[in-house]
Amino acid sequence: MMVTLVTRKDIPPWVKVPEDLTDPEVFQVQSLVLKYLFGPQGSRMSHIEQVSQAMFELKNLESPEELIEVFIYGYQSIKVRAKWLLQSMAERYHLRQQKRPSLTTFWEFGGPDVSLKEC
């Protein structure tokens, strides 16, 4: 069992203290992806916590890739589901970035199709 030191003071009411604050699910994500997941300045984080009934803590890692470590606390099945949800959202972000043509490519092929009629 992994015991971590929870630094958050605003523990959500659905998290049972102390039993839900041990053995967190942990994964790493780039800070840019984290902004996609939680919004600017983490504006959507509390909503995602409430919907998933989990609690998240973020820890900056000193790395050139600007990685953030995400700790997920809560009941075991809730932690696993919340981790899966966040990792799925991160994967979707990466897939969208790969499919999205760069602006350079966009303008190399003539920019927007001006022959389309407005509806």
Curated annotation (Swiss-Prot):
KH domain residues: 24-86
Transmembrane residue ranges: none
Keywords: Cytoplasm, Developmental protein, RNA-binding
Taxonomy, superkingdom: Eukaryota
GO cellular component, one term: cytoplasm
Entry GO MF terms: RNA binding
Subcellular location, record wording: Cytoplasm
InterPro entries: KH_dom_type_1_sf, MOEP19_KH-like
Main location group: cytoplasm
PANTHER family: DEVELOPMENT PLURPOTENCY-ASSOCIATED PROTEIN 1/5 FAMILY MEMBER, DEVELOPMENTAL PLURIPOTENCY-ASSOCIATED 5 PROTEIN
Record function comment: Involved in the maintenance of embryonic stem (ES) cell pluripotency. Dispensable for self-renewal of pluripotent ES cells and establishment of germ cells. Associates with specific target mRNAs.
Protein family (similarity comment): Belongs to the KHDC1 family.
Protein's name according to its UniProt entry: Developmental pluripotency-associated protein 5B/5C
